[in-house]
Regions:
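N-terminal, Lys/Arg- and Ser/Thr-rich interaction peptides
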Residues: 1-28
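Positively charged, aromatic-enriched nucleic acid-contacting surfaces
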Residues: 24, 29-125
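Accessory terminal regions of nucleic-acid processing enzymes
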Residues: 130
Length: 130
């Protein structure tokens, strides 16, 4: 596992944002960028869906992420706003990002200000708790 690559801040163009409730701006990294980072930094990647629960208005997924023999688990959830399949996909992405964050991938931001980014000079990116 290349820990330096795994924990490297993402480039500014990789940090997306969307408007949420009450006009708040949420910053995020796409799941494809998170998966690309994991695949580049690790020789062996295994993702296992251990549990999934479908409720009336929400789905919850528990995944295990194994990177080069080291394992982390995380839950993800999503409201059902359309199809159950879309909600499961969203919950899986949520769980995978949270598990990746446990390995040090800087992919979760709990802030209302723009996160710090990689400026090419070795600055450490913004990280926070889930």
């Amino acid at each position: 596992m290349n820990k330096e690559l795994l924990t490297k801040p993402f480039k500014k163009e990789q940090i997306k944002n969307r408007e949420g409730r009450q006009g708040m701006i949420y910053y995020y990294i796409t799941i494809s960028d998170v998966i690309d980072r994991i695949n580049q930094a690790c020789d062996s990647v295994q993702i296992i869906v251990k549990e999934k629960e479908i409720y009336e208005s929400e789905v919850i997924v528990l995944i295990t992420l194994n990177l080069d023999g080291e394992t982390k688990e995380s839950f993800g959830s999503s409201m059902i706003n359309g199809s159950i399949g879309d909600a499961l996909k969203s919950a899986h992405s949520d769980a995978l990002k949270k598990a990746a964050w446990l390995f040090g991938v800087p992919c979760i931001f709990n802030t209302t200000t723009e996160p710090e980014i990689d400026n090419g000079q070795g600055n450490v990116g913004f990280r926070c708790s889930v």
